[in-house]
């Protein structure tokens, strides 16, 4: 299963087109069947929480001489790193990074086509050279508690991280301004 966040800036129809394009790419790339379930935000949650669950078969689909379709050998996504290495294929970790990049590229293409000035990046803050800390996934149980005004350890952690990241972004703006003034002198 692959879970992807869908841009809330896109309409429902455009989000569906985005997920379907990605699912087709995965099906063609790995020779598997793909099923998609698009979820919209629940009434009590974050109204931007559009996401999709993408299920892939563990076996490849192949058309038999009879015309029927059958599940056959393991797909690349189900192979162990040893099996991948024997076949000269990237490791599971490398493949996951490639899938994340593929998702970012197709999402950014759809955002651009919709004339929306927003982009996503598949890389971590560290890999992007940003001195920002990542937040932790809150999960549905903690989200429900937080919505009721009950603070959770993960929620507290994320609030501290957001404060820190905001301070770091403000510091970067100040440093950039100071550098510009220094260069003018």
For each predicted feature, which ranges?
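Glycine-rich, histidine-containing beta strand-loop boundary motifs that form or position
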Residues: 4, 38, 56
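Short histidine-centered catalytic/ligand-binding loop motif
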Residues: 3-12, 85-92
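A short, contiguous, amphipathic alpha-helix enriched in charged residues
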Residues: 8-38, 99-102, 106
């Amino acid at each position: 299963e692959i879970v992807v966040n869908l841009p809330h800036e896109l309409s429902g129809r455009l989000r569906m087109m985005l997920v379907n394009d990605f699912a087709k790419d995965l099906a063609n790339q790995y020779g598997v069947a793909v099923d998609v379930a698009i979820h919209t935000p629940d009434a009590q949650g974050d109204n931007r929480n559009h996401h999709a669950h993408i299920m892939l078969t563990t076996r490849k689909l192949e058309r038999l001489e009879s015309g029927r379709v059958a599940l056959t050998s393991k797909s690349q996504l189900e192979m162990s790193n040893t099996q991948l290495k024997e076949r000269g294929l990237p490791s599971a970790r490398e493949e996951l990074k490639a899938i994340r990049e593929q998702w970012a590229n197709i999402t950014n293409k759809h955002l651009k086509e919709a004339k929306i000035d927003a982009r996503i990046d598949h890389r971590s803050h560290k890999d992007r050279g940003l001195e920002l800390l990542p937040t932790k996934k809150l999960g549905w149980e903690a989200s429900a508690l937080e919505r009721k005004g009950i603070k959770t350890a993960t929620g507290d952690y994320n609030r501290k991280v957001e404060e820190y990241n905001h301070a770091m972004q403000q510091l970067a703006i100040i440093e950039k301004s100071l550098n510009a003034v220094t260069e003018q002198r």
